[in-house]
């Protein structure tokens, strides 16, 4: 698992598995990116500093 935080845009990207991104679904401030086979590849958290404060 790898992660990258971009403070300029306040986005946290968590790479959970290998594979190419095929499509994504957004629910609130979280975008879940999937492979063609439907496996979760990456999570993208928008407004990350606000979202992670609730964890």
What are these regions (language model features)?
Residues 2, 7, 13-31:
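Structured beta-strand/loop patches that form or line metal/cofactor-binding pockets in enzymes
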């Amino acid at each position: 698992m790898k992660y990258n935080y971009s403070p300029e845009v306040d986005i946290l990207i968590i790479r959970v598995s290998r594979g190419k991104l095929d499509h994504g679904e957004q629910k609130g401030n979280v975008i879940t990116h999937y492979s063609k086979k439907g496996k979760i590849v990456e999570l993208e958290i928008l407004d990350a500093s606000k979202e992670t404060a609730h964890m």
